[in-house]
C-alpha cells in the first residue's frame, strides 16, 4: 500500500529536555550482540519505526535526544550503537573509531536492527525506516540499498551513491537534507542523485540549504571538548506516514 503523503511535513525537533526515556535493548547481528536504546511513544501502537543512526562521534547524548524527540512525535526510535560502546571526545578520535568499523559489520548491524523493530508487537512492520546524520546519513542510504522492505530513508548530509545498479536496489522513499556549502558533498552530486532516483520512478524529496555547510544542526553536548554551538541552518526532518 502506498503511503500518502510520504513526506507530509518537515518539522524542527526542539532543543529541549528529553521527551522519552530510552530503554536499553540488545539484538543479534550474526554471532555478535548489538546494544541499542529503544524510545517508544506513549500508547500501545502499532507505531511507525525508525532506526536512528549516529554520526561519527558515536551514540552520544545529541543522538539520544533526537531519538527521544522522534518518539515524542509518534515513532518507535531505535538508536543503535555501531561503535560497540565507544563515544569519541575529539574529531581525531571520531575519525579513528569510524575508520575502525568494518563496513560489512555495520551494514549487518543495520539489517538486524530493522529485523528487530519488525519483530516488536507494538511496531508496524510495514512502516520501518531509517534516519542518520553525516556518517549515519550514508548508512541510512546503505540500509535502503540493502533492505528491500525499508519504507523510507532520511539522509542528513550523508554520502550518496551514483551507480545506477546500486540505486535500482532502493525501494524506499528518500528524504535528503544537504548544505549548499558542504565541501564533502557537492550540490551537483546531490542534484544528480535526485535526478537518477526520479528517472527510476522513485519518490525522492531533496532539500538543499544554500548557505549551510556541514553539519546543519546543533552538535553533541555530551563532551566539553566537542564544540557546543553550530549554525542551525535547517530543520531535522520528521516523516509523517499516512496510509491511503
Residue ranges of each PLM-predicted region?
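Primarily recognizes the serine-hydrolase "nucleophile elbow" in alpha/beta-hydrolase
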Residues: 111-171
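Acidic catalytic loop of the alpha/beta-hydrolase fold
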Residues: 181-185
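Short beta-strand/loop motif that positions the catalytic acidic residue
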Residues: 170, 176-178
Amino acid at each position: 500500500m502506498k503511503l500518502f503523503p510520504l513526506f507530509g511535513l518537515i518539522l524542527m525537533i526542539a532543543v529541549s529536555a528529553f521527551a522519552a526515556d530510552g530503554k536499553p535493548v540488545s539484538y543479534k547481528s550474526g554471532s555478535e550482540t548489538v546494544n541499542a536504546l529503544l524510545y517508544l511513544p506513549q500508547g500501545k501502537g502499532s507505531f511507525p519505526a525508525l532506526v536512528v543512526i549516529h554520526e561519527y562521534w558515536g551514540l552520544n547524548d545529541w543522538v539520544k535526544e533526537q531519538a527521544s524527540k522522534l518518539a515524542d512525535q509518534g515513532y518507535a526510535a531505535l538508536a543503535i550503537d555501531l561503535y560497540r560502546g565507544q563515544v569519541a571526545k575529539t574529531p581525531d578520535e571520531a575519525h579513528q573509531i569510524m575508520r575502525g568499523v568494518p563496513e560489512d559489520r555495520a551494514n549487518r548491524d543495520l539489517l538486524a536492527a530493522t529485523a528487530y523493530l519488525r519483530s516488536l508487537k507494538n511496531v508496524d512492520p510495514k512502516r520501518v525506516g531509517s534516519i542518520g546524520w553525516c556518517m549515519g546519513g550514508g548508512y541510512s542510504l546503505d540500509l535502503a540499498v540493502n533492505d528491500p522492505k525499508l519504507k523510507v530513508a532520511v539522509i542528513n548530509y550523508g554520502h550518496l551513491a551514483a551507480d545506477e545498479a546500486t540505486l535500482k536496489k532502493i525501494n524506499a522513499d528518500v528524504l535528503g537534507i544537504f548544505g549548499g556549502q558542504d565541501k564533502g558533498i557537492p550540490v551537483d552530486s546531490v542534484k544528480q542523485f535526485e535526478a537518477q532516483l526520479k528517472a527510476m520512478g522513485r519518490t525522492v524529496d531533496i532539500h538543499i540549504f544554500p548557505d549551510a555547510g556541514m553539519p546543519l544542526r546543533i552538535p553533541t553536548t555530551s563532551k566539553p571538548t566537542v564544540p557546543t554551538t553550530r549554525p542551525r541552518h535547517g530543520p531535522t526532518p520528521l516523516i509523517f506516514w499516512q496510509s491511503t
